[in-house]
């Protein structure tokens, strides 16, 4: 059998996000995502994911982001402090994605999903990766479920889950 470190090394050759899948706890990813450092657990929350029926070209997003102003930057230290304090609202406030504005300009549906999640009671909502999936963080199951139901009428790929630590 392979050790966890060996699996993570092999996984990194498959993709930058793969090593995370071997551990799964809350981690700080550095490098291209292959260097992982354990963090305090994520506070309890409900996560709603909605993927609109479009395909986003990651290559095109990266090409466009090179020419776009970066309006937001991650507050890594603030995020770590919020995790250490088990502060869901602090975590949610610090969620950001520097690619979101570029993708949302090209695919307005992304911004529409984000806005609707927040109207539906999400503490925050952010696009995942280069898109088009948007995830919302909810502090209450009923709000999360009602939001999921409201999206299920329009989209096939709607998933509601809970943070596991």
Regions found by a protein language model. Give the residues of each.
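Contiguous, small/hydrophobic- and glycine-enriched helical/loop subdomains that border
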Residues: 1-28
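Conserved, helical-rich catalytic subdomain that frames metal- and/or nucleotide-binding sites
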Residues: 23, 28-124, 139-142, 148-152, ...
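Conserved glycine-rich beta-strand-loop-beta hairpin in the small C-terminal domain of fold type I
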Residues: 132-133
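Conserved SAM-binding motif I beta-strand of class I
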Residues: 136
